[in-house]
Amino acid sequence: MFAADRSARRTFRMNSLFQKLEASPLLARGGPFAVFVLLTFCQGKFGEASRYWFYFAKTIVGAWLIWQVRPLIAELKWKWSWEAAVVGVAVVAMWVGIDGFYPRLDRLLSQVGLAKAKSETELASELWNPHTRFGQGSALAWMFIVTRVLGSSIVAPPLEEVFYRSLVYRYVVRPDFQSVPLGEFRWTPFLITAVVFGSAHQEWLAGILCAFAYQALVCRHKRLGEAITAHAITNLLLGLWVVWRGAWKFW
């Protein structure tokens, strides 16, 4: 009896959540991303190990949220094309290639007095490297590495593309964002969305250029599919580069 009651309450809460998402196109596109960002913020806030466990949690939660909102967001569809593949490869080559030619975001903010400068030791301690926390080559370290590669290439792209390219870009045009055709080109949202996207990454300049490329795909094809695919390819290749070269600073 009690088990049935608990099951009924869970079903009621799930139905209530789905109804709220269905009633608000903005919440359906922005809510999952907000949860994803909140869990990202929690990484490292509850001890060193939480940096990795919260990434694991946000990957699972993010995948579940995508599944929940998928029926509500018509543009949330992957689309393969060679053009998307080329853009994805070009972006990761650019991301790695220009590294070192401009200051990372934390250093830039410290240079303009908006953040405290960090020593090399502090920066090294903040690297997302499971081998240093759980032991070189340990099963737990590799579990988190695989989780990050999969999470960044399968979960993050649809969440971020729906938020930035579908919601933010069109909302900048006008709050009634659904009245703005997906992929309509305008300079103001094109630039603002790219800067917002770039500022969410330590490699801010690469992030801005990356956003230009993904948004160009959306504007060209009038859909998100190619941008999601390009984003996934970029993150997958960058993840493999990080693991192969030990370039943990990109994570």
Label each PLM-derived region with a short phrase:
Residues S24-A93, Q111-K118:
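Alpha-helical transmembrane segments in multi-pass membrane proteins
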Residues F2-E22:
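Short, Lys/Arg-rich, polar N-terminal cytosolic tail immediately upstream
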Residues S16, K20, L38, F46-A49, ...:
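Juxtamembrane loop-transmembrane helix junctions in multi-pass integral membrane proteins
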Residues M94, G135-W251:
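Transmembrane helix-loop-helix hairpins at the membrane interface
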Residues A74-A156, R170-E184:
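Juxtamembrane helix-loop-helix connectors linking adjacent transmembrane helices
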Residues N15-F18, F41, V96-G97:
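Helical anchoring/docking segments at protein termini
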Residues K45-E48, R70-A74, R104-L108, H201-Q202, ...:
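Transmembrane helix-loop junctions in multipass membrane proteins, especially transporters and channels
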